[in-house]
Amino acid sequence: MAVQQNKKSPSKRGMHRAHDFLTDPPLAVEPTTGEVHLRHHISPSGVYRGKKVVKAKGE
């Protein structure tokens, strides 16, 4: 099992964790309906890239 030789200081620990944060998901606006959805996913109304691909639950 690997064991560290020297304790990592709080500064170095923070530098190591500098890129461990979560980023906001990329959102897109459907041009035909104006709805916001995740990129490369269908909108809540079932539209993807301007075409109706699935029926919505209320339809």
Swiss-Prot record:
Coiled coil: none annotated. GO terms for cellular component: large ribosomal subunit. GO terms for molecular function: structural constituent of ribosome. Pfam families: Ribosomal_L32p. GO terms for biological process: translation. Keywords: Ribonucleoprotein, Ribosomal protein. InterPro entries: Ribosomal_bL32, Ribosomal_bL32_bact, Ribosomal_zn-bd. Residues 1-28 are annotated as: Disordered. PANTHER family: 50S RIBOSOMAL PROTEIN L32, LARGE RIBOSOMAL SUBUNIT PROTEIN BL32. Belongs to the bacterial ribosomal protein bL32 family. This is Large ribosomal subunit protein bL32.
